[in-house]
Swiss-Prot record:
Biological source species: Cricetulus griseus (Chinese hamster)
Annotated Basic and acidic residues bias: 464-474
Regulation: Inhibited by excess phosphatidylserine, but not by phosphatidylcholine nor phosphatidylethanolamine.
Top-level taxon of origin: Eukaryota
Keyword Transferase listed: yes
InterPro entries (alphabetical): PSS
Protein name stated in the entry: Phosphatidylserine synthase 2
Amino acid sequence: MRRAERRVAGGSGSGSPLLEGRRSTESEVYDDGTNTFFWRAHTLTVLFILTCSLGYVTLLEETPQDTAYNTKRGIVASILVFLCFGVTQAKDGPFSRPHPAYWRFWLCVSVVYELFLIFILFQTVQDGRQFLKYVDPRLGVPLPERDYGGNCLIYDADNKTDPFHNIWDKLDGFVPAHFIGWYLKTLMIRDWWMCMIISVMFEFLEYSLEHQLPNFSECWWDHWIMDVLICNGLGIYCGMKTLEWLSLKTYKWQGLWNIPTYKGKMKRIAFQFTPYSWVRFEWKPASSLHRWLAVCGIILVFLLAELNTFYLKFVLWMPPEHYLVLLRLVFFVNVGGVAMREIYDFMDELKPHRKLGQQAWLVAAITVTELLIVVKYDPHTLTLSLPFYISQCWTLGSILVLTWTVWRFFLRDITMRYKETRRQKQQSHQGRAINNGDGHPGPDDDLLGTGTAEEEGSTNDSVPAEKEGASAAS
């Protein structure tokens, strides 16, 4: 059994729900506690294989006399040794399926990628671009200029053979990429409103920055119909349906060899690629100021990571179809889900000394480093001023958001406290009026009432005393 499961399942009996420390948004988990070879640590096995491999290269393989080849091979070998160490020794994250080692691997890849970005950041612009030739000799060449936007007619009457040719031209490989991307982003964020806000805001960013990057120039129907409504919207819808299924699913796990039927074994293998448990994200941005700022920060980092995809291709001279661009997207898909879960746990944690998760920390560092590379490698493009009407729109939007923030978390609270104080005072005055009206002593009559009661008490006490004296005399 993996370390994450063993930590949660400690003290629970066979087939019992793991309720200890479970949040209200977290599903119940039933686990029989099976500990198989698949889940055990293999630190000695990995160390033995690594030692044998290095020994073979050192003792039995002749070293080539090619300096460039040896340099590349040495760098790759160093990275592989680090990955072997990290996969076996790094700390587990919040996810454990299909295997904790899978997520430890991507954590180590995050470290390698961040170090690579730092190296690129400390090079000159020319050296940094030419260094990529060591990765792929086809890189390091200025990108050819392309025509974006163009004819935006949905129905082109001048084209008799195919009047809808503009639509067919837009149906390329990026259409399924948009759908799959937003489906996976929805699984990361787990909130419909946040996904739609990010989707719409990115289209506004493309409108605003098309004077800097030509590939942001698209037709209006490409922005709002094909991207937001069809590709992004359909991906978000399918993602929300998947989240609904995951939140209702029963999480009951048995060891593979404890399942008697082959059908059950195959089903258990397939479910190995589903979550071990499920936590429903309740971001509640309007509940407090720190949650509101945190959600705004998450949206900004998401948008910044999206923009970095296009700006890095532009400043590092990478064609959009290059495999490095695809590998970066695959990387963010794998690390983004872990980072979002760690951020949510960080926001939900009630301890005074909270600690941001390791993967979330690395994703934030990577996003900022990518931005710094863009700023260093092409400051001229980034400093191209926004058109006046666009800057006015962003200024107005910023003022509206700031005004709502001040009203919601400052003025509204002051107003509510003032109204509550007035309500309490009115209730107090009404209580006094009622007490004075029905004959009961009010708050101002306490002292007077007490004195009268004492006088009456002393008078009543003297009457029996006089009667007792008279009877004794007789």
